[in-house]
Amino acid sequence: MGGISIWQLLIIVAIIVLLFGTKKLRTLGTDLGESVKGFKKAMADDKSQPQDASFEKVEAKEAASTEQKAKEKEQA
């Protein structure tokens, strides 16, 4: 009763096609599709790179080097 019927949706689509034209709507759809593909690819690339593991390795190296420096100072 309060919803939009299929006929009302068809009328809205027809008005949009008349206003913008099919060529402009096609290019808009293509641009939108490419944007979504790029976003999905970026999200997949972000998940595949384990940033925490490399961060721990750097911390371990820094801790080892500071311990070596402390031992060298004690020996001197």
Swiss-Prot record:
Q: Provide a Gene Ontology MF annotation, just one.
A: protein transmembrane transporter activity
User: Domain of life of the organism in this record?
Assistant: Bacteria
In the UniProt record, does the keyword Protease occur?
no
> Does this UniProt record's set of keywords contain Chloroplast?
no
Cellular compartments annotated = Cell inner membrane
Region described as Disordered: spans on this chain: 43-76
**What's a BP term from Gene Ontology annotated to this protein?**
protein transport by the Tat complex
Q: List the disulfide bonds.
A: none
What Pfam family does this protein match (any one)?
Answer: TatA_B_E
What's the protein's topology in the membrane?
A: Single-pass membrane protein
Main localisation: membrane
For this protein, the parts annotated as crossing the membrane are: 1-21
The Gene Ontology CC terms held by the record are: TAT protein transport complex
Q: Which UniProt keywords apply?
A: Cell inner membrane, Cell membrane, Membrane, Protein transport, Translocation, Transmembrane, Transmembrane helix, Transport
Quaternary organization: The Tat system comprises two distinct complexes: a TatABC complex, containing multiple copies of TatA, TatB and TatC subunits, and a separate TatA complex, containing only TatA subunits. Substrates initially bind to the TatABC complex, which probably triggers association of the separate TatA complex to form the active translocon.
Which PANTHER family does the entry link to?
SEC-INDEPENDENT PROTEIN TRANSLOCASE PROTEIN TATA (PTHR42982:SF1)
NCBIfam families hit by this protein: PRK01833.1, tatAE
Tell me the function of this protein.
Part of the twin-arginine translocation (Tat) system that transports large folded proteins containing a characteristic twin-arginine motif in their signal peptide across membranes. TatA could form the protein-conducting channel of the Tat system.
Instruction: Give the family this protein belongs to, as stated in its UniProt record.
Output: Belongs to the TatA/E family.
> What is the name of the protein in this document?
Sec-independent protein translocase protein TatA
